[in-house]
Amino acid sequence: MSNEADLLHGPLEDRHRDLGASFAEFGGWLMPVSYAGTVSEHNATRNAVGLFDVSHLGKALVRGTGAARFVNSALTNDLNRIGPGKAQYTLCCNESGGVIDDLIAYYVDDDEIFLVPNAANTAAVVEALQGAAPAGVTVRNLHRSYAVLAVQGPRSANVLAELGLPSDMDYMAYADTSFRQVPVRVCRTGYTGEHGYELLPPWESAGVVFDALAAAVSQAGGQPAGLGARDTLRTEMGYPLHGHELSPDISPLQARCGWAIGWKKEAFFGRDALLAEKEAGPRRLLRGLRMVGRGVLRAGLTVLVGDTPVGVTTSGTFSPTLQAGIALALINTDADVRDGQEVTVDVRGRAATCEVVRPPFVAVKTR
């Protein structure tokens, strides 16, 4: 682990320490990984509500005449599918079709798009966009201008309503409001598969919002949750994590994110390579694996059919919901592996039998 002094620190670190958090490095940031324990936090989010500080996530602003048109010519998804007050999952690709990052784009208006990339990739996304931006369009890195607080779970709407924050909105919509004189962007987004929200207050005012949310979450039977639970929750949903299921060497098609590509658009980064891959078919595809017996799967393990290696796990964990080991894996398409088929995974020399499944592993409840 990196020395704490070398890591970036969020605006709420003292509060997390007061709550008894344990910390770990993620994307160059020192972040709370757990409080009461990952399983407890996971189950609280699935059954009640969890409060996550994900302020390490990046923030960037594209502004100027035709900003939306420019972003639409750079990122994969089609911004014309949405409009002001809506958000969209999209990808920033390289010219070979690999993924620089996956991110959320918030459509403010035709001349302003707000972006939330991953922590470690913010500078790369900003650099890619700055290099392509036309005259009159600026791309600014606002990484430490805003915090991001996620309220996730079946009681999340009750928590926001209790505080007078907007909660009755469609999935992937957002609203700008204020809370105790602090401006807040409230978004119907998340990374858990549950009904939830992500709130963006100014970095320096995040404590006001966090304290109120923490009290309301506790009153609703929930608890603060760290990045450990965030990872088990997203893995159960089959959501990709950059550096695992997506990377400069892993395309959106291989990760089953082709739905986030506007194929009819005339331009976006990596378009020619991705069209060629779509025509030929990806050489590997993301699949889910569920252990038949006991054990835990991790990333980087070899997947075999018989004695033949056919892929590698990209993420793995113990699913608190299923009480079973699960994993995501990139499997070679020429191996003709089918859902329901049994394969083995080499876990430190032990052959672990797994069933191939199509994620999500548990029901989606985002809407």
Swiss-Prot record:
It is an enzyme of class 2 (transferase). One of its GO terms (cellular component) is glycine cleavage complex. GO terms for biological process: glycine decarboxylation via glycine cleavage system. SUPFAM superfamilies: Aminomethyltransferase beta-barrel domain, Folate-binding domain. Transmembrane segments: none annotated. Keywords: Aminotransferase, Transferase. The keyword Transferase applies. Its EC number is 2.1.2.10. The keyword DNA repair does not apply. Pfam families: GCV_T, GCV_T_C. It catalyses: N(6)-[(R)-S(8)-aminomethyldihydrolipoyl]-L-lysyl-[protein] + (6S)-5,6,7,8-tetrahydrofolate = N(6)-[(R)-dihydrolipoyl]-L-lysyl-[protein] + (6R)-5,10-methylene-5,6,7,8-tetrahydrofolate + NH4(+). GO terms for molecular function: aminomethyltransferase activity; transaminase activity. The glycine cleavage system is composed of four proteins: P, T, L and H. The glycine cleavage system catalyzes the degradation of glycine. Belongs to the GcvT family. This is Aminomethyltransferase. It comes from Mycolicibacterium paratuberculosis (strain ATCC BAA-968 / K-10) (Mycobacterium paratuberculosis). The gene is gcvT.
